[in-house]
């Protein structure tokens, strides 16, 4: 193999988010004192917040008429792990594209931050069913740099698999089996085709199963209309929930804000724009505003109508990451010499991200809650999520955005 020939690398960020919403007895006030406020945790949350919003806006720029769903944590983890073996401009572009300021944060601290994040997400004692995994798939005649392997295992809990990429169907099956097992069967064909020059693949997945602290009662679910746009309406099963809910109107965003807690340590922030204000919401949304919503919890008597939904996202990360400044890794100028000891250069030939989300009121019974309330001075708000809205799901200990989505059509 001469140095003029470039070998291919596949990057796969695959995930599943499944959200059943039963088996919770009561709502507890959020204890912000229990949040992990370590420097590493704060650093990763800040950068992932910026990264999440940048990615979201790029996806909206590519298409503002379709559902959006992705995991900032999954994508960032995959690229950060790849940066362990990158050098020069390739290295700088990756970390700066992930919104890290390299003059303020050392590379060692960045990887320690991801290490801490993954340890937190994979805690076995958490009520939240949340797990992540990283797989390195190496051609059986390719020798990787030992330092890269050690750091990938230490900081990113990576598993290493030896495969024969010359047998593309066999190699594809090994990768797909890893993702399918990690996502408990929610993603069954993460890789559809392998480039013929692929010799190394990196796969990341994240699986999330959450149960609402305050569940929906399936008996209250009725068919209702969802307005995709001014001329399109679809029928959806609309769930209903009443009681003391964390909901308020944000004049800055011209949107209603609803916070829903999961059993464990996760919170979903739903943003329902006023009529004609979706573009304003998307342009104005910031991590600072989201942080305020998470810190300043306010419950009031309210009723919400929310669609049962299932959406997915599949993205070519080359077109998604390039506007964020990550370009060198995809072309022949890529410097990934810290990954392999071979003379032939390595470049990222494929980069795929897949995501699946289900929100429903799974289960045959919901918790019974008796609430005694004083008569309010004003009528409680009734929120109908019957037109496009945004949402972000956070892990509370690290305040990291696990998932970001936009629901344009809940039936697709």
From Swiss-Prot:
Span list, region RCL: 368-387
Provide one Gene Ontology cellular component: extracellular space
Q: What is its main location?
A: secreted
Gene3D superfamilies under this entry?
Answer: Alpha-1-antitrypsin, domain 1, Antithrombin, subunit I, domain 2, Serpins superfamily
Domain of life, per lineage: Eukaryota
What residues form the membrane-spanning segments? none
Its UniProt miscellaneous note says: Murine alpha-1-antitrypsin is represented by a cluster of up to 6 individual Serpina1-related genes. The precise complement of Serpina1-related genes present varies according to the strain of the animal.
Family membership: Belongs to the serpin family.
Q: What is this protein called?
A: Alpha-1-antitrypsin 1-3
> Which source organism does the UniProt entry give?
Mus musculus
